């Protein structure tokens, strides 16, 4: 049941620090009522998933669902999908905001330019995109595939947080 599922998510949050819990959601399955959708929206908001992969039900000829009564229109499926995607974006942003001002570790993956400046970017354990100003490193130094830690500063983009340059150290 949804109550059992939420309880499982609560247990994960109790025993693991800041876990990135994600889910997939199909909107507009045949027979889904406005009330069903409202319950789903309330549930996904209560659980506060870090990310939701939201997609519309897609009718496929020859499947049991193709013959089910209560097929929804594409516009209803699109609207419901849009509502959940917006909810997911809000929850994702709130999840990322929780690390601002806190020490975090990042596995550096690659170098990229963002708004005309050069950064080394990577992911935290929670899959939050982090940027480190490239000029923090000595010329010729390659931090790729190394772990660094520092204090999370501010949002560089909607989905990427920059580390405070004075706090960055390599993790041995």
Where are these predicted regions, by residue range?
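Conserved non-cysteine loop/helix-boundary elements of the Radical SAM core domain that shape
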Residues: 1-51, 57-76
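Terminal RNA-binding accessory module
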Residues: 67-172
């Amino acid at each position: 049941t949804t109550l059992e599922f939420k309880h499982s998510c609560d247990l994960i949050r109790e025993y693991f620090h800041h876990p990135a819990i994600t889910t997939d959601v199909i909107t507009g399955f045949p027979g889904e009522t406005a009330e069903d959708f409202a319950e789903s929206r309330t549930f996904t908001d209560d659980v506060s998933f870090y990310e939701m992969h939201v997609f519309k039900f897609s009718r496929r000829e020859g499947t049991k669902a193709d013959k089910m009564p209560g097929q929804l229109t594409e516009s209803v499926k699109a609207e419901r999908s849009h509502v959940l995607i917006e909810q997911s974006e809000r929850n994702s942003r709130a999840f990322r905001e929780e690390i601002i001002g806190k020490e975090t570790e990042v596995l550096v993956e690659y170098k990229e330019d963002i708004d005309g400046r050069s950064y080394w970017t990577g992911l935290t354990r929670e899959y939050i995109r982090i940027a480190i100003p490239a000029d923090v490193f000595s010329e010729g130094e390659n931090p790729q595939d190394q772990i660094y830690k520092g204090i999370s500063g501010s949002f560089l983009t909607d989905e990427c947080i920059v580390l405070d340059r004075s706090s960055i150290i390599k993790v041995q």
